[in-house]
Amino acid sequence: MNAIQIKNITKKYNNVTALDNVSFTFEFGKIYGFLGRNGAGKSTLINIIANRIFADNGFVLVDDITVRENMEVHEKIFCMSEVDLYDGDLKIKEHFKWINRFYDSFDLDRALEISKKFNLDTNKKFKALSKGYQSIFKLTVALSLDVPYVIFDEPVLGLDANHRELFYELLIKDYENSERTIIIATHLIEEVANIIEEVVLIDKGKVLIQENVENLLETGYSVSGVAKEVDSYCSNKNVIGYDELGSLKIAYVLGKKTPLPQGSNLQISTMNLQKLFIKLTEKGGKQYE
């Protein structure tokens, strides 16, 4: 099976459970949003996939090959993460040369071309770059590799608005030109909402949702009006959260819409991915059903 399969992964740090029996699949040929608040468990799982740390229980398969201590898998995956794994004293162009030696699929010309688009000075040492330009260097490497699975862990932290827009533009072009799986792990939901096809939402080490974005948004809606009417309409529905202001109330619902009662003053609106994310992960939010 061409996919990254997560099988019953559990990871604990002392008494803290970072991942709690997590199982799901990143299928080949899609753009995923791997969403969750800071500390939800995203980076821990990415580090397990990348073989940087080991799970306490469970395992990861990439194209039916076990990830743990298997060098063959490393040629299939590249993970761009927040962690600085690069020698600070090496110039960017020297890093490119080293990466070119380790990855047969690295396109040096493309890396230099992307560097120019971002105005990344390849003669600078890595440690001399600002936080934003260190991120740009790592993005450039990821976009210049022809591997089946590319994972971006919080890719736009430190980037200004223009650079973020350029990154998403290059990412979409890259996806259109080469068949691969792209996974964007982020808590910045609004920025990726129009890019991703599938969403995996993780919170407190558990997966709340794995769903096609379009299907998910079709089932999510809000009901607003006088609190009594809202409560009556939503009495048998899967309400994932509320907002209240005086006698007015907004209920956020997942599930099939039903007709409003005759003469009702309630309003039904679509719910965006950001609001869905907030309501599912805030204190007291219900799980997706």
Outline where the language-model segments fall:
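Catalytic Walker B motif of ABC-type/P-loop ATPase nucleotide-binding domains
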Residues: 150-154, 159
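Walker A (P-loop) phosphate-binding loop of ABC-type ATPase nucleotide-binding domains
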Residues: 36-41
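Helix-to-loop junction immediately C-terminal to a conserved catalytic motif
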Residues: 50
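ABC transporter nucleotide-binding domain
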Residues: 167-183, 187-253
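Conserved ABC transporter NBD signature motif
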Residues: 58-73
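C-terminal coupling/interaction segments
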Residues: 241-289
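ABC-family P-loop ATPase nucleotide-binding domains
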Residues: 81-138
